[in-house]
């Protein structure tokens, strides 16, 4: 899985315009082949700091999205930002959920030494 995170620090008077752009992009992006999810987040301490978080099945799907006209529209918003877009691409080889939390918490209760998730002790 590929996680694509775009952080935007918006000029305050342009916040509504950027939000409208992101909202108009989110649903069509979520419908693209290979897109697992596309969500918009707002920093609770700074409403002008926004994050677009996308999850993709493969890098090939993400690359196709990045080359699209729709993504070009997002790149065109740079003039409405206080600083350049911060873009990060993460390749996730493994993910865990609540079962891992329960397992870890049960280990702690049993006074078992912590491991790195692969059986090796954490020092």
Please state what every model-predicted region is.
Residues 18-19, 65:
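A structural signal for short hydrophobic/aromatic patches embedded in well-ordered alpha helices
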Residues 40-46, 75-123:
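Glycine-rich beta-strand-turn "strand-cap" elements at beta-sheet edges
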Residues 2-8, 39-66:
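Short, well-ordered beta-strand segments in beta-rich or mixed alpha/beta enzyme
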Residues 9-17:
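Short, surface-exposed ligand-recognition loops at beta-strand->loop->(often short) alpha-helix junctions
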Residues 4-7, 21-24, 28-31, 40:
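N-terminal leader/targeting segments and the first structural element of proteins
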Residues 1-4, 15, 38-41, 89-92:
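Short acidic/polar alpha-helix capping motifs at helix-coil junctions
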Residues 24, 30-36, 55-89:
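An amphipathic, aromatic/His-enriched active-site/gating alpha helix that lines ligand/cofactor pockets
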């Amino acid at each position: 899985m590929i996680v694509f995170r775009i952080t935007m620090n918006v000029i305050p008077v342009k916040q509504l315009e950027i939000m409208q752009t992101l909202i108009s992009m989110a649903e069509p992006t979520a419908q693209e082949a290979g897109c697992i999810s596309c969500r918009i987040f707002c920093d609770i301490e700074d409403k002008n700091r926004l994050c677009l978080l996308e999850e993709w099945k493969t890098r090939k799907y993400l690359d196709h999205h990045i080359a699209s006209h729709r993504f070009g529209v997002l790149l065109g918003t740079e003039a409405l930002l206080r600083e350049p877009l911060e873009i990060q691409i993460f390749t996730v080889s493994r993910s865990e959920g609540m079962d891992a939390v329960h397992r870890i918490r049960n280990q702690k209760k049993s006074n078992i030494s912590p491991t790195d998730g692969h059986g090796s002790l954490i020092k």
